[in-house]
Amino acid sequence: MATLQDIGVSALINLFGAFLFLIAFAVLRIQPINDRVYFPKWYLTGERNSPRRSDRTLVGKFVNLNYKTYFTFLNWMPQAMKMSESEIIRHAGLDSAIFLRIYTLGLKIFAPVMVLALVVLVPVNVSSGTLFFLKKELVVSNIDKLSISNVQPKSSKFFFHIAVEYIFTFWACFMLYREYNNVAIMRLQYLASQRRRPEQFTVVVRNVPDMPGHSVPDTVDQFFKTNHPEHYLCHQAVYNANTYAKLVKQRAKLQRWFDYYVLKHQRNPHKQPTCRTGFLGLWGKRVDSIEYYKQQIKEFDHNMSLERQKVLKDSKLMLPVAFVSFDSRWGAAVCAQTQQSKNPTLWLTSSAPEPRDIYWQNLAIPFISLTIRKLVIGVSVFALVFFYMIPIAFVQSLANLEGLDRVAPFLRPVTRLDFIKSFLQGFLPGLALKIFLWILPTVLLIMSKIEGYIALSTLERRAAAKYYYFMLVNVFLGSIIAGTAFEQLHSFLHQSPSQIPRTIGVSIPMKATFFITYIMVDGWAGIAGEILRLKPLVIFHLKNMFIVKTEEDRVRAMDPGFVDFKETIPSLQLYFLLGIVYTAVTPILLPFILIFFAFAYLVYRHQIINVYNQQYESCGAFWPHVHGRIIASLLISQLLLMGLLASKKAADSTPLLIILPILTLSFHKYCKHRFEPAFRQYPLEEAMAKDKLEKETEPELNMKADLADAYLHPIFHSFEKEVELSSSSSSEKETHQEETPEVRVDKHETQSSSPVTELGTSSHHHHVYNSTSPSSHYASAYEQSSSQYEYHYNTHQYEEHEYRYN
């Protein structure tokens, strides 16, 4: 069990590590060569240029020669606090702003309660002496005397703990209500203030019935013209284009090589670039690089055009899914919230995600298999949770060396060394647990994808839910149970079964020492590592040296990342759980929790402003999950305290806690009915008000033209019609120029993107793909440098969307 000395060693190690990370970040961020790594958000919005261009000296292009900036290396902290919440919403979206509010909620809940608990409960716990009399039977440390374990059984002092639990519950519920209300208002205001966006007018229809003699588009068109004649506008069929998407990815690679050799030739016109045609360009016939890749692209485009025509013509590749658009938000909201058919399993409608939020691959999953998939994944997650009990038990064995010493005395020569003992108990357990948890979010996201959800935001929320249950069962309950077993192994083996509940009741509060070490590793050093961005830094420079060939490649190499909701939100909920549970049990843990919330808020604020570029905008759809799991933490805390008092034989005071879970559940039920509907559906009142305002300001608005291809698969995004390859070079050129429109969105707007200019805003450009053969265009680009980039940059869009369907 970790002692005060062990906690001190762990604190020094983690504080020193965090300090080193912050110093390294402060120095690396001001170097010109690293500017794209630490400020990619501003490059994507077009508001920042590389400082290397303005410095004329060779050394100055790589190293910051202004010595004054090294004395203000901590100025990133006040800079991160300057941007207001409304500015963050405009800059990074509502999801990012609401995510930051989780940290401020933690500070608001725990700061006043920490003062109360430290002033009231710590003196009460210390003044008792139960552990002094039990130290021969149990493994205890000085820090455990600050916990409820040190209070004597049947003591009247337990009324103080019950009073603090009541005060904390009422305060937490008050803050949760205020925050839920504020977030709901922010969401509705954000939706009301948005420009026209395709998801506001569109629903996704699944399980379209197969009508003999009718195609899916005809069936959908006829059904909605019949049942929604006043508001139905158009629809977009969905194709299984996963095979074609792979071809798009391969073609993009060829395009990048072609761009690279064209640029290389422009820089040195007197030398013709060449390459070998063999494996990895290491052997084979040496050929003209530009002509070789131009021919490769021409042949590839021919194959892609054939595949595209196959996708559009083959009825087997047309899915029983459609995106149906209406001429008003009200019409779309009514359709999404009502049953469309007397058979409730057909014509299933729901509000459409925004176009960049769609996970296209899962649209091809048959609806009938979704239930089976969810059942299989549910069983798999259950098995995974219990499989991970093994490494959790191993971690707890490291944290409880005294318990092992009594059973295995041969370990004493190693564990008696002070530094080894402090390192093993104070630092290593938290680090080991962090390592074991590292790969889990990715595994759980893959499981969520298998379940068949069609929106990335939903996938991440489902993965986050799985990760939370995992953290609850394994990290919290598993660490307590396994830790208590290892800690008091000698007692369990040498005492009567009737004494085991008393031992558990005394030992559970002592696990706060393990969680303190975990908080310092994950919440202090881990958060400092987040701002350092060591992995993206190394990868960027490796790509810059070996892979980057064009400016487009350099933009891709920046990899700004995004707030990983599937990992960060469950981790946050674990911190809430620890703080809530240990407030009345071991309040000494609260200062460590508060330091985490304050430091993490500062770091993530900086990252959201300067680094992250979100994949999608869900308008804070994750908040009901955050609220619900904090309520669950309150219930766990109350039940745990009841169990502890029962094990302490506090028969007079324990019944006073029975009413608390009932009040908490009643509060949760009220909030669920009061606020959650606004996060599930678009209110008809809001939709109608927005429609009326729009009709008054733009009475001649043509919505059909804007919504026609808003939900076309990204690789078919510019148009949906068959294209015949022309053998004439001039014909090819005309076809390309006519059928490859470039859909641009204002790059200075950083809210959720949309592929339709009139309907959305974006933080980066969206470009459209043309599946016709552009061979003549490549020749023109090769000969006329002024026109080459107009086409070449179009391939970037496919790779942005590739991860969604591949």
UniProtKB/Swiss-Prot annotation:
Top-level taxon of origin: Eukaryota
Compositional bias (Basic and acidic residues): 731-750
Bias (Polar residues): 751-762
Keyword Transcription: no
Region (Disordered) location: 726-786
UniProt main location, coarse: Golgi
Stated role: Acts as an osmosensitive calcium-permeable cation channel.
Family affiliation: Belongs to the CSC1 (TC 1.A.17) family.
Record protein name field: Hyperosmolality-gated Ca2+ permeable channel 1.8
Source organism: Arabidopsis thaliana (Mouse-ear cress)
